[in-house]
Amino acid sequence: MKALLDLFKQVQQNEQFDAIKIGLASPEKIRSWSYGEVKKPETINYRTFKPERDGLFCAKIFGPIKDYECLCGKYKRLKHRGVICEKCGVEVTLAKVRRERMGHIELASPTAHIWFLKSLPSRLGMVLDMTLRDIERVLYFEAYVVTDPGMTPLKKCQIMSEDDYAAKYEEFGDDFTAFMGAEGIRELLRAIDIDRDAEMLRQELKDSKSEAKIKKYAKRLKVLEAFQRSGIKPDWMIMEVLPVLPPELRPLVPLDGGRFATSDLNDLYRRVINRNNRLKRLMELRAPEIITRNEKRMLQEAVDSLLDNGRRGKAMTGANKRPLKSLAEMIKGKGGRFRQNLLGKRVDYSGRSVIVVGPQLKLHQCGLPKLMALELFKPFIFNKLELMGLATTIKAAKKLVEIQEPVVWDILEDVIREHPVMLNRAPTLHRLGIQAFEPVLIEGKAIQLHPLVCAAFNADFDGDQMAVHVPLSIEAQMEARTLMLASNNILFPSNGEPSIVPSQDIVLGLYYASREAINAKGEGMMFPDVSEVIRAYDNKMVELATRITVRITEYPKNVETGEFEKTVTRYETTVGRAILSEILPKGLPFSVLNRALKKKEISRLINLSFRKCGLRATVVFADQLLQSGFRLATRAGISICVDDMLVPKQKVDIIATAESEVKQIEQQYSSGLVTAGERYNKVVDIWGKAGDDVGKAMMDQLKVEDVTKRDGTKTTQESFNAIYMMADSGARGSAAQIRQLAGMRGLMAKPDGSIIETPITANFREGLNVLQYFISTHGARKGLADTALKTANSGYLTRRLVDVTQDLVVIEDDCGTSNGASMKALVEGGEVIEALRDRILGRVAANDIVNPETQATLYAAGTLLDEDMVEEIERLGIDEVKVRTPLTCDTRFGLCAQCYGRDLGRGTLVNAGEAVGVVAAQSIGEPGTQLTMRTFHIGGAASRAAVASSVEAKSNGTVRFTATMRYVTNGKGGQIVISRSGEVLITDDHGRERERHKVPYGATLIVKDGMVIKAGTALATWDPLTRPIITEYTGTVKFENVEEGSTVARQIDEVTGLSTLVVIDAKRRGSVTKTVRPQVKLLNEQGEEVKIAGTEHAVTIGFQVGALITVKDGQQVTVGEVLARIPTESQKTRDITGGLPRVAELFEARSPKDAGMLAEVTGTVAFGKETKGKQRLEITDMDGNKHEFLITKDKQVLVHDGQVVNKGEMIVDGPADPQDILRLLGIEALARYIVDEVQDVYRLQGVKINDKHIEVIVRQMLRRVQVVDAGDANYIVGEQVERSELLDENDRVIALGKIPATYENVLLGITKASLSTDSFISAASFQETTRVLTEAAIMGKKDGLRGLKENVIVGRLIPAGTGLAFHRARKEKDSWEAEERAALLQSEKAARAAEAEAQFADVSSTPDSDTDAS
């Protein structure tokens, strides 16, 4: 009976664990795992194919080859189960025990484990406090180490060469002991008293003053504490016993032709055994020291390469000169155990085929080829056949299916009814890459896909393939049906917009049907209802675009009753729109359809329908839109021809003008007014503008056509040109593409990204000449090459993002925090890039939102803001709202629903169990891949935004300058801006900010503070191609360090022969002048240096590298005059190529090179004494303390003497360093910086991602903190720990009435954050597997299986979605059972005590009793 139960025991034991612990195995442990010692290197007998006894495949040790059969064949069958054969020693049992039984090798000499030796930092080195170099010399028998100095002056752990040893041995004899090899190291490790050492280190840490020492001690202390806590003995890092992997995991497979394919591990084990046996023999024979020593070294090397081949020295190679694959390689990397087998399992019940379009399907259906369905649903069919009595056995059922009996098809129909299948298209970049559909059986061999889900799958029908998976269990079917059915996933999780938006021909059909034409057939007719309109249209009385009057039935929703009420209204509309009104869902007014339906409009329509009419109505509506679109596109019969590409008449003039302008620039260049770089920039600018003008002229011409009205007068109407309609509707093509067809191709980029200054003036209709064609090929090829490279990059970014966020799940409803982030509309360059409504939609209000006019509470804190609410907020002109954000959520080890807000893929508050981390990672990673794949569509045509050179007001209002704005008035009365962060605001009558414009240094202001202006007024102008250096004082120029040949060079232009002075790069100067900085001082009439007002400092104006000096020594200058110009670099085209690495850089939190410097404190700036190469900047804070900063001289300082700066303000020009922002300005500022920067990259490509996804990633980057002061908590100062863990520990400490630890935030890049997670399983499966496992083993780490990844790896349900509920229920049950058990024990104890007491009462009457009542 027990044996029968053994069959089932496997299943029960794997579900019931809550954590996995990793540690070092002691020799005793290894022996206890083993079923016997492997003594011989033989594998199997090559004649009989039976394993050799005591060899690497020995059946006695590892178990039988065949189920229930011993090796010699004496015992066969189940009845002998458990017998051990007396002849061959094999236990009669299942052959699969060969997958789990381990052996061992007793090593003749101890060997060090290479991971703990070589994995940096070397753990052995840290425990022994020796260098890796020294330990290696000892281990590989190059030196002796003193293990016991005895009474001699030698020190413990001292290293000696052989000659030293011989000399010392002469001197001291046996008074000391020194060893070579792992024995010596083992003795040292055994002698360590960890508790004492740790105590001493703690003392040292307290007393030590030097930074370096503190760092060193803390590191060693950490390792020692790890050993202390885990109870692992350090000498276990040296192995005396080597475990042998079960043979089925390193198989030997016979190939045809008598050869064998073997796993590399067998070779590696063979070497170890051979060397070990040879060493044993040598030791028995008492061979000379030098020989055994060599053999020991070889044994150490053999064990090294078995564990991690190639880690030290040359890798061991097999017969074919290929390095052997060691145990370490089996688990790491893309093909290793983790990523290949545990996270990348293959699935049965699946198939794949080419996809074709299925326009007749409903949204929740897919067409499944009959043969495929038959194969996939085989077990279900067998079951049905047996139930119906058509087959008695499975074998008979199989036969029926194989010959495809007609009854089988009926059963198949029955089986697949309401059994959803999952379709997946690789690459699965976001959760919409796998969706469930109900299968419809079809003939043929291709899967039919619904056209509307193509956008979500990013599928097209040019040969794409898709995979089908069958959910088997009832639970799986239910989840597929409720959570994954395509009709339940109609919104993108990344931005909450509909994913089932019609595209291409559907859009074209709907657009064509909803356009209106002047004087079309039957114009002005009146109809009583829509059916009459349809009749008239079918009888060719009217056209689709005819303008008519018709009565239309609508069903608006009654607010009070919630019912739909029928109303009939007269509308002036077109025939097509009236016909379309038939499919409008109840609750939407006709006015939403009464316009030309472009792609954006249709998207809005579906979104509106979803919000107002619910999911079901929307799905039906989308399907009907699809049908109508296809039908109407077919009826429209739109086609394009060469004559549709109208080349604009103005093209010749525009190009002629541009050419003359270019000539003018060339002349200016040859007369030396502009430099070569400026000339190039200006030429590119002129041609860019010319291209745009041609494009504009072409679109203007395409857009309209002449028509005659009914009364015979001429007028124009929007064009019915086929190409224009396709682009305008959003069906296919864009203005940029039409521009290349009919305008001019424009500027092209070279492969390196720089723009070729001669444009292609021809277009595709006119045709390109050979040179133009050749220039074009650059762009086309670059596109293809980029795609391949960038897809890989984007995939890697997604992988890192998923890894850092995979354990973030919504685990509770509300964490109760009142923190949040203040949201404002995002305004840049005076334009509202993202309105406030879009930023707060779907968030939860953190404070009450108050009506600014009545001061009444509009929405209470904790309200989820929906579309109507944000409309209202915007209407009232509220310009700042504080909302909850994942960044400030107080939930430990997860998030709460209130801080996250709306689940964008569902449109409601997020559910507990939603894996918001993974959704965020996918939302950011998915467009990355899309964009990278999309670069080459414009054909490399340089799309470069024309550089802005002025700024205008967009609205009426009052001008306000910000506090940071500073300007001077020059001799001509112009106001020149001299601050670098100045901004001009326009405010409305209520004083609310309407727009804000950054004004660059050196710009000329046209308006004054407080001026009332109209929209369109210019505010400021500047030269976009150079940055000026301006004087704020009047005086005579006196150059300092401006020496030709050393700090400046005279550039003589080849063409013009004119010269200018250019400051040269310090790197190109001689050593003497490297550190000096060319600058200007000003002298007054008396010849004294002009001082900065109110200080003793002389005015000094430094020149940056590359500056062109425009003044001469001794020249008189006035306020606001330009002293030098710095040309901006020639523009390169930016697409997401610049973008993807930028996103990666932000998420990796890399400090940019040449980062700008932020003020550490609030205070007043002064310049101190300059040192060589650096200038000294002092900030005196409010308490009068001075803070010094040294700044290299080539940097641009943004502040001046006497200026007051705020903490965190830029003082030295350059890109911001996220670490500085976090340190000086806090979490919110950092999050805003990262969110805005990432959004900039995506916005440039027109991709919408909700801010909260980026915030979720930032939360994960900030999840670790550094201990500043440990208090009474169990930490070391400077240690980095998980925030949630530290807060838990602090709670514990506070509860005991002790001092909690204080900490500061740490910003980690996503790779670092992934590797530093608490879960070693997750970290090991990500990157640097060996390092992670080594560290975890020493610390005896316990993985609580909190994240998704760890659970996937150990094969449990993930703790998200339905799995979260499952695990919670299981834990509750466990704790309930534990309580029950405790209660039972308690009652038993009480009963026992009562019994004992009764006994005691009996016994106490007898005087000499010594019974203990226990």
From Swiss-Prot:
Region spans: Disordered: 1395-1414
InterPro entries: DNA-dir_RpoC_beta_prime, DNA-dir_RpoC_beta_prime_bact, RNA_pol_asu, RNA_pol_N, RNA_pol_Rpb1_1, RNA_pol_Rpb1_3, RNA_pol_Rpb1_3_sf, RNA_pol_Rpb1_4
NCBIfam families, alphabetized: rpoC_TIGR
Residue runs in coiled coils: none
Full protein name: DNA-directed RNA polymerase subunit beta'
Gene Ontology terms: biological process: DNA-templated transcription
Binding annotation for Mg(2+): D460, D462, D464
Essential cofactor(s): Mg(2+); Zn(2+)
Entry's transmembrane regions: none
HAMAP family given in the database record: RNApol_bact_RpoC (MF_01322)
Note describing how the cofactor binds: Binds 1 Mg(2+) ion per subunit.
Catalytic activity: RNA(n) + a ribonucleoside 5'-triphosphate = RNA(n+1) + diphosphate
EC identifiers of the protein: 2.7.7.6
Principal EC category: transferase
Protein's job: DNA-dependent RNA polymerase catalyzes the transcription of DNA into RNA using the four ribonucleoside triphosphates as substrates.
Subunit structure: The RNAP catalytic core consists of 2 alpha, 1 beta, 1 beta' and 1 omega subunit. When a sigma factor is associated with the core the holoenzyme is formed, which can initiate transcription.
Protein residues bound to Zn(2+) 2: C815, C889, C896, C899
GO molecular function terms noted in the UniProt entry: DNA binding; DNA-directed RNA polymerase activity; magnesium ion binding; zinc ion binding
